[in-house]
Amino acid sequence: MTLRDLINKLLGRQQASAARARERLQLVLAHDRTDLSPDLLDQMREEILSVVAKYVEIDVEEGAVSLETEDRMTALVANLPIKRTLSGDIKLKEQSTESSASK
């Protein structure tokens, strides 16, 4: 997702059908080049979300994991809106683990 796409999404602007078709074609080509099945991509998405959720609270409904192709290079892009960090919770877990280990 480019900066322009993000701004358009925030402002509620609709994409032109040609732009939408181009984006879909790029997605199909990216899937084809990487040889990733949709099931594998969904599994990767779930695992990425669960790992990130250990450290920050994310907005799963607004988040997206996708393949993007630019200049003949395909990238896995995770766009995950962060609601808040869980650093306080992590510190508590670390202290709990340390005190259990010292017993």
From Swiss-Prot:
Keywords: Cell cycle, Cell division
Gene Ontology BP terms: cell division; regulation of division septum assembly
Claim: Cell division is one of the keywords in the record: yes
Pfam family, one: MinE
Organism superkingdom: Bacteria
Similarity comment: Belongs to the MinE family.
Role, per record: Prevents the cell division inhibition by proteins MinC and MinD at internal division sites while permitting inhibition at polar sites. This ensures cell division at the proper site by restricting the formation of a division septum at the midpoint of the long axis of the cell.
Protein name per Swiss-Prot or TrEMBL: Cell division topological specificity factor
Gene expressing this chain: minE
